[in-house]
């Protein structure tokens, strides 16, 4: 009798475990099915975006902005190194422009992000940029930005405070001349702040260094360069976005 009871109890436990295992398997199957469905939807959305004209335009603008950022990084960094403003370790100086290999790709990526962000913010806040929207103005803005960077390496002042104030005035003048939007001013200040923090982190960890640092391991005028660079790249991104929008409407 006792053996029969033990047999019945073991059978009921086995059925309970089987039932519980079946529930777990069914739950896992549902979760996997939902995950696969979400992945399929995401891939379909990505494919449709890339296949659309807007997706192609986004990729083209990103590539153009990346190329511009790489080119400006090479040229401007060459100006700084020629004046011994920035110093890289000898083992790092390996390219034709005597620049660390990672600087141009990082600047290109940052230019692509900033250039795409400016028109996106304009559309989000409902403040389309309408001031001097032509390529001639953009090219003049680039020339002024290069001039500001060259001045930071070329001009000699009695102290760095005078140089920093002069470059700050020139940077604000660049924004006022070629932008004048609140979003451009806000993004320029944000970019200058974040880029300065990143630069301080790199210098602090010995990736490279500045000669005669006067502001937390770096030069005090560096935020002015980042601000004017953000405004310049933002104008390029806006002009590219306007051109792609007109082309889309024309099609």
From Swiss-Prot:
A Pfam family this chain is assigned to: INSIG
Sequence motif KxHxx, location on chain: 245-251
Extracellular face of the membrane: 82-100, 157-159, 206-219
Subcellular location: Endoplasmic reticulum membrane
Positions of transmembrane segments: 59-81, 101-118, 134-156, 160-178, 184-205, 220-237
Keyword Hydrolase recorded: no
Gene Ontology cellular component terms for the protein in this record: endoplasmic reticulum; SREBP-SCAP-Insig complex
Keywords for this protein: Cholesterol metabolism, Endoplasmic reticulum, Lipid metabolism, Lipid-binding, Membrane, Steroid metabolism, Sterol metabolism, Transmembrane, Transmembrane helix
Family according to the record: Belongs to the INSIG family.
Name the UniProt record assigns to this protein: Insulin-induced gene 1 protein
Species, as recorded: Xenopus laevis (African clawed frog)
Recorded name of the encoding gene: insig1
């Amino acid at each position: 009798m006792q053996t029969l009871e033990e047999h019945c109890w073991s059978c009921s436990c086995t059925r309970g475990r089987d039932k519980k295992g079946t529930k777990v398997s069914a739950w896992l199957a549902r979760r996997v099915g939902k995950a696969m469905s979400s992945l399929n939807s995401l891939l379909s959305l990505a494919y449709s975006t890339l296949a659309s004209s807007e997706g192609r335009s986004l990729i083209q603008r990103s590539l153009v902005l990346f190329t511009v950022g790489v080119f400006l990084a090479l040229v401007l960094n060459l100006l700084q190194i020629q004046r011994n403003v920035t110093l890289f370790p000898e083992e790092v100086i390996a390219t034709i422009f005597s620049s660390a290999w990672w600087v141009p790709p990082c600047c290109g990526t940052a230019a692509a992000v900033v250039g795409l962000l400016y028109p996106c913010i304009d559309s989000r806040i409902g403040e389309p940029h309408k001031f001097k929207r032509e390529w001639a103005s953009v090219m003049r803005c680039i020339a002024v930005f290069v001039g500001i960077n060259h001045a930071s390496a070329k001009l000699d002042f009695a102290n760095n405070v005078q140089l920093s104030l002069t470059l700050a005035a020139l940077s604000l003048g660049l924004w006022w001349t070629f932008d004048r939007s609140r979003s451009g001013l806000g993004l320029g200040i944000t970019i200058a702040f974040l880029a300065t923090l990143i630069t301080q982190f790199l210098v602090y960890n010995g990736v490279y260094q500045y000669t005669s640092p006067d502001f937390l391991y770096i030069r005090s005028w560096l935020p002015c360069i980042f601000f004017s660079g953000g405004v310049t790249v933002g104008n390029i991104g806006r002009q590219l976005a306007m051109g792609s929008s007109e082309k889309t409407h024309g099609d």
